[in-house]
Amino acid sequence: MAQGLDALTREELVELLEITAKDLIALDGTWFQSLEREQGMDTAMEHDRAAWRRFVPSEARRLKKLLDLSDRCGLEGLAEALPLRCTSLANEWEILWEDDALVFRITDCRVQNARARKG
């Protein structure tokens, strides 16, 4: 699975991660737009929600394993994992602590920017 990766520098690996995250978001948008054209916005939204509902737990399990987070890692563990999500790698974001709450905010969203450009 890692063939070719050994030849890359750390900087190239980081760039590849960013490219891959952007590609995943672009793929998500492409299939969404295709479904939207054929079936309408409501159906596309329904399928998008269903796909992300299935994907996010898998992504969380992989990040939890990578970071060696405990089952009850709390908001601190979440704050450690959120920056490594594919959507985080593809967008600009910030994490804020407000009282006892963790706020994760996408500050520059590739998907929303693309939709705004298209009108």
Task: Cite the ranges covered by each PLM segment.
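N-terminal accessory segment detector
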Residues: M1-V103, D108-G119
